[in-house]
Amino acid sequence: MYNGNPLPKSLKGVLLLGFLFLYIPIVSLIIYSFNASKLVTVWGGFSTRWYVSLVQNEQIISAVTLSIKIALSTAVAAVVLGTIAGFVLARFGRFRGSTLFAGMMTAPMVMPEVITGLSMLLLFISMQQFFGQPSERGFFTIWVGHTTLCMAYVAVVVRSRLIEIDKSLEEAAMDLGARPLKIFFLITLPLVSQAIASGFLLSITLSLDDLVTASFLSGPGSTTLPMVIFSKVRLGLNPEINALAAITVLLVGIFVLIANYLMLSAQRTRMKAVAAAMREPAKPGDAGGAVATAS
């Protein structure tokens, strides 16, 4: 267990090597995205030609647009379904079929994506034969596949947070006559908001990064960004990919900084509210106000 003492120099050296191993390739990739040469490993001078070429590449722009739409739609659906599933797993305890339900929720996390993608492809083909829907594979089929995967991660994150929360606040609200739905939205949901935000960001990341499932569930005209990158890299290293990766790193970095800032600001606000509530003297018979303040 860490006791607050300074880290040994040897451990600092190992950490430094680990960070260098992780981030030197990213830095070199960003540097070579400004390379004027078509050979990505030979420096030919500073140029932004590949960024201009990237903006003019309709295939990549279309893939980026589709991937962002799928990622945002997946994150919204996964957060809603995963939060409900996590609440059921954490609050409903043992019920008939609870073990099966928990296993089905966590199965997409441990099942190989090849199996998931192939099974869903066969499902959609069978549905098309019997019901005529979906008429084609594209946005909808990829969205369903990504939601199935991401909701499992959201459910696990939300369930872990709910287990840590003291149930006394919810029980006190119930004693004061609050309905279960009101308790969920006014007490439980704010307490798990950080877990929900983490699940939302994780779902976006998983969706944007997915290649295997999208390869099975996509059709003509519905190529996602990872599929475009993979197809171009198979034919050889392309300087446009370096430019695309550099833009992605920049956008992800900005997005993460903003998300962390908002989450830290919300945490500071809650801590100040709790500190103010603890300093304020309690009034006799004001149990309802105490519960409302704590929530």
Label for each model-derived stretch:
Residues M1-L7, S73-M105, I125, L257-L264:
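Transmembrane-helix boundary motif in ABC transporter permease subunits
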Residues Y2-G13, R94-G97, R159-M174, P180, ...:
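C-terminal transmembrane helix and the adjacent membrane-cytosol boundary/short C-terminal tail
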Residues Y2-P8, K38, Y51-I60, L208-Y261, ...:
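Interhelical loop and adjacent transmembrane-helix boundary motif
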Residues P8-L16, L20, A85-M120, E170:
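Cytoplasmic-entry segments and transmembrane alpha-helices of multi-pass inner-membrane transporters
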Residues V14, F19-I26, A155-R159, I165-D166, ...:
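Transmembrane alpha-helices
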Residues I24-V27, I31, V80-I84, L118, ...:
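Membrane-embedded alpha-helices of multi-pass transport/permease systems
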Residues L39-G44, T48, V114-L149, L181, ...:
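Membrane-interfacial helix termini and adjacent extracytoplasmic/periplasmic loops
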Residues T65, K69-L81, A85, F185, ...:
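Hydrophobic alpha-helical transmembrane segments of multipass integral membrane proteins
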